[in-house]
Amino acid sequence: MTIRRFAGALIFCSSLAFAQNMVAPADKSATPVEPKPIHSFDVSAIDKSVDPCVDFYAYACGNWRKNNPIPSDQSRWGRFNELGERDRYLLWVDLNRAATDPKTPLQRKYGDFYAACMNSDLADKLGDKPLLPTLALIEKLSDKQGLAALVARLQVDNGTPVFFRFGVEQDEKNSSREIAAVYQAGLGLPDRDYYLLDDARMTKIREQYKEYAVALFKLAGDNDEKAAAEADSVLAIETALAKGSTPRVELRDPAKRYHLLPFSDLSTLAPEFSWTAYLSNTPSPTLAELNIGTPDFFKAMNAVIADQSLDSLKSYLRFHALNSAAPWLSSPYVDLNFGFFEKTLQGQAEQTARWKRCTSLTDRALGEAVGQDWVKENFPPQAKASMEKLVAALEKALNEDIQSLPWMTPETKEQAEAKLAAFREKIGYPEKWRDYSKLEVKRDDLIENLHRAAAFQIDYEINKLGKPVDEKEWSMTPPTVNAYYQPSNNDINFPAGILQPPFFEFSKDPAVNFGGIGVVIGHEMTHGFDDQGSKYDAKGNVNNWWTPADRAAFEERTSCEVNEYGNFEPVAGQKLNGKLTLGENTADNGGLRIAYRALMSVLASEGDDAATRKIDGYTPAQRFFISFAQIWCENRTEQYSRVSARTDPHSPGMFRANGAVQNFDEFGKAFGCHKGQPMMPEHPCVVW
């Protein structure tokens, strides 16, 4: 995936927990059980009744899907989830040990954080009492002139996501420096479309959202009439903000989200909001300029502040304070929040066990503290050394691929090769760990732990202003099951969490590892040359390095992918957005080709029969493609599929597998397909 590093206040769902110098009460909802081992190539997952040339995903994953229904505490279950659950269990082992018998001050810190989170008994006893100081701040607001200072306190001190995001990012046209930035935000539903589309499903969701808001206000003590009026205010304000929000697809274009302007321009866009008062209530120094990422949004926000009554604005702030805290308050709040956001929107049948939620929360707050011990126990040095060799092999293959492109001129190829040569690789974990010594954690006070963590994070980010960019910083924690390309750093990043089976396994043959982690590596590299990454140069600056003819040829080829994936239908009546998913689809296709090229190079060096030697009855090429498809094995709820089709830049696993192989003739050769079959179309889409 591609990540643009933008760090505002760390948003947490807050609550209070208490465990005076004792172990937190056991989680009554579940007892942690070590997940079963995971393997990279699973013959039993294959459904041999399916013709791989007709539906390769169903062939490679058919039996896995039949034998792995979605657990009741999930809305999606796939190979990523399998590894994620295993990594989370191993992280829990460290947290539980630190909560009961810490050996170092750092272990005590993250152990206390986890222990505080696990005290659900006290959360039930306290109800919404932990949130009363925040609600009192909102209630004290006596005029609109005080709104900006209050918003700053809610964002920075409490981590409450209201109106917009403020934080720090790399300057996209001068990547060596950090700048302040503001962007659209402030919506409770997943996307602007949920407010603006009038089809029956969206109308129903808005009705359910209002019902949720009414119930939330009533839990906080409002009567029926007041709760309904407040919910109406929330919907009206969020709908107005949604109308002023830039669509996701447009935000993929750096030019649409980069507006480096004087700080005073914010007052021109939104004069009803005192930006000077806002800034004075953050850790930020006086700003001369900043990136106003979505200018039209701030015009809409200004109209909201001007047109809505003070009481309506306070209802909006109050709702978001309650909503962000609800998952960690007493059981009625937790259940209500789960019922709408997970059950209604995502189709998840049951609440996730508290130990899982607290483990993930601790990783978010203190990820590089917990990660130090996790890496020592779960990521041996030889794993990093093996990854370094794989990355080098993939970089060599991508360079060869660029050189062989028939549609690109030598002039642009030279620039592309220079960008590839400038890639930086980060594998496993940071070279230098973050210092959490200034973050105070109390074993008996979760809500303030979360507030302090939010303030700690924004202070950490604001402190970067005016300083050189730290190119060694990570945007994911070590146990994360993911990987990313950061265009402003021109680097590829692979946390230790993903460097495990089914993606990477020491004992497996090269075909399996190249089909797993090899494709992931190639995927992240290709992001440097997709519809977004191709607009950044070797130094990470937005800068056109293409000839006009080559750019036109590139866009013609990517338009093929837009149309191809835009016709995939993950759920009845709803197709994928080919423009939203273009970057990930391009990276999937390019990553597959590059990894295959690298594998063939390795096999060629191993001897004459290496490319034909069968294991489990499959040639290396077949094992490569099956390994690739099996990392995408998954089952999804209908609700999850609908939300992700509208908001997720990644295609569902079925289309990530089939879409990539049907565009690659080498797949057809490996399985004896012929032109015209579904997995070997007459006119495949080929970019890289």
Predicted features along the sequence, with ranges:
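Bacterial N-terminal signal peptides
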Residues: 7-17
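Short, Gly/Pro- and small/polar-rich lid/capping loops
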Residues: 28-44
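Hydrophobic/aromatic-rich, well-ordered segments within soluble, folded domains that form packed cores
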Residues: 46-66, 195-218, 582, 589-594
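Active-site-surrounding "flap" and adjacent substrate/cofactor-binding loops of secreted or lumenal enzymes
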Residues: 32-37, 50-55, 59-125
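Noncatalytic, helix-rich "gating/capping" subdomain that lines the substrate-entry/channel surface
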Residues: 96-393
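N-terminal secretory signal peptides that target proteins for export/translocation
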Residues: 1-3
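Boundary at the C-terminal end of the N-terminal hydrophobic targeting segment
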Residues: 17-26, 30
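Intrinsically disordered, low-complexity linker/terminal regions across diverse proteins
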Residues: 30-34, 84, 234, 269-272, ...
